[in-house]
UniProtKB/Swiss-Prot annotation:
Alpha-conotoxins act on postsynaptic membranes, they bind to the nicotinic acetylcholine receptors (nAChR) and thus inhibit them. Through its two C-terminal domains, this homodimeric protein would bind to two nAChR allosteric sites, located outside the nAChR C-loop of the principal binding face and at the adjacent binding interface in a clockwise direction. This toxin specifically blocks mammalian neuronal nAChR of the alpha-7/CHRNA7, alpha-3-beta-2/CHRNA3-CHRNB2 and alpha-4-beta-2/CHRNA4-CHRNB2 subtypes. This is Alpha-conotoxin VxXXC. It comes from Conus vexillum. Expressed by the venom duct. It comes from the Eukaryota.
Length: 47
């Protein structure tokens, strides 16, 4: 359901939605990804 999806953060195309996990300011490429953190800040998706 698109209403449930997370808005992509600034820097992405406005109006796009993220159906996958968000990591920091970006959208992970697949639903099974987890976010790797550095000092509590999301730095990259681990897929």
């Amino acid at each position: 359901d698109l209403r449930q999806c997370t808005r992509n953060a600034p820097g992405s195309t406005w109006g796009r939605c993220c159906l996958n996990p968000m990591c920091g300011n970006f959208c992970c490429p697949r639903s099974g990804c987890t976010c790797a953190y550095n000092w509590r800040r999301g730095i990259y998706c681990s897929c």
